[in-house]
Amino acid sequence: MAANIQAYLENLQQPWGQIYYDILFEQLKDIKGKRVLDFGSGFGLVANHLAQENQVLAVEPNEEMVALRTQDHPYQQLVGSLDQLESFEDASFDVILCHNVLEYVENRKAVLKAFIRLLKPGGLLSIVKPNEVGR
């Protein structure tokens, strides 16, 4: 297992890792009956949580993370990145999540443009990016 993936798994077991997801799930609790794109889905924790009451499509470029993903609830998982976004129809998602991903993306502008194209009018775009200064 890659060292960065092992470190992330270990972080999830720490109190701050658990608190992060508790807070996040509380903030996302009202998302129900929506078509959701989880871009950069990692281990599928958020996709799995939202799949309880939504139709979720998860996209993750790291095959090792996809192999270790959580899937207690049905959601579609694709391996890929920006290339996968190009295959979806305009205005096809009510909610797009991009959590802790943009710092790893080379062409952020292209990804954000794709989100604009894919998001339905009045849809929700949720972006989380760590503050590097605060780390």
For the regions a language model picked out, list residue spans one by one:
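Conserved class I S-adenosyl-L-methionine
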Residues: 1-32, 34-42, 45-49, 65-68, 124-135
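Class I SAM-dependent methyltransferase core
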Residues: 38, 60, 103
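Class I SAM-dependent methyltransferase SAM/SAH-binding core
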Residues: 43-84
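A short acidic, Gly/Pro-enriched loop at the edge of an enzyme's catalytic core
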Residues: 86-95
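A short SAM/SAH-binding and catalytic strip from SAM-dependent methyltransferases
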Residues: 95-107
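A short glycine-rich, Lys/Arg-flanked "PGG" loop and its adjoining helix->strand segment in the class I
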Residues: 109-124
